[in-house]
Amino acid sequence: MLDARDIHLGFSGTPVLRGATFAARVGRVTALVGPNGAGKSTLLRIALGVLAPDRGTLTIAGADPAKLSDPQRAAMIAFVPQRASVAFGFTVREVVGFAAPGREKSAEVASVLECLSLDQREGELFGHLSAGQQQRATLARAIVQVRAMPGPTRVLLADEPVSAMDPRHAIDAMALLGHTASQGAAVLVVLHDLTLARRLCDDAVVLGREGVVRAAGPAAEVLTPATLEPVFGVRFEAATTESGAQVLTPVRGADRIP
């Protein structure tokens, strides 16, 4: 569905992406992880058609998103930004309903609001919500948009969509993204919580600081201390919980603390 091939991009002569190659498939949630400045958000902007690579291609169902009209993009791609940018004078239900005009009061919107624990806040002004609640409302809007898309090409891009959420709501949000993927969408999500990425994403792409894909594949196989330590420059301790899930904890060496 989403295929990136040999993506190169630089700003003011400084390379940001160097030959990034990966894919995000229908029915799967793909985590995009890496240190700050590795080019994760830049890749999402290319996928949105906002930026064009200097070299290489990124296509969605064979189409270059930069060459699509705004209505065509909206019918294929939903986006969750790092920070909410909607007008604060609207209610939660109105914000979510923007994704499907005329369906603001539909059962679809109500269902998504309930899944993200926003059903009791749907009448509140978006601007009165906490940062985590605003993230949930913004995510709800994108999911409603995906469900309303008319064609078979459905892609959801999310840039750190759970960074302000508490653990319970972050897990609920990731589970809903997984359900959205299972309904025929390709989901590509930037995450800094590596344990969440390993446990709740199907696949993972690891970007190094130099904008090179260091590893890509099933999340459980890719997100390991051996792969992550040289990328992030810290040691990771892996522990297995009673349920069998692996938890990754970064450990900063005492010799590096000033």
Locate each region found by the language model:
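The feature captures the beta-strand-to-loop junction immediately N-terminal to the Walker
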Residues: 33-35
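Helix-to-loop junction immediately C-terminal to a conserved catalytic motif
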Residues: 48
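Conserved ABC transporter NBD signature motif
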Residues: 56-64
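ABC ATPase NBD coupling module
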Residues: 64-78
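Conserved ABC ATPase "signature" region
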Residues: 106-121, 143
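Catalytic Walker B motif of ABC-type/P-loop ATPase nucleotide-binding domains
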Residues: 156-160
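Conserved switch/coupling elements of ABC/ABC-like ATPase nucleotide-binding domains
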Residues: 209-221
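ABC ATPase nucleotide-binding domains
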Residues: 225, 229-258
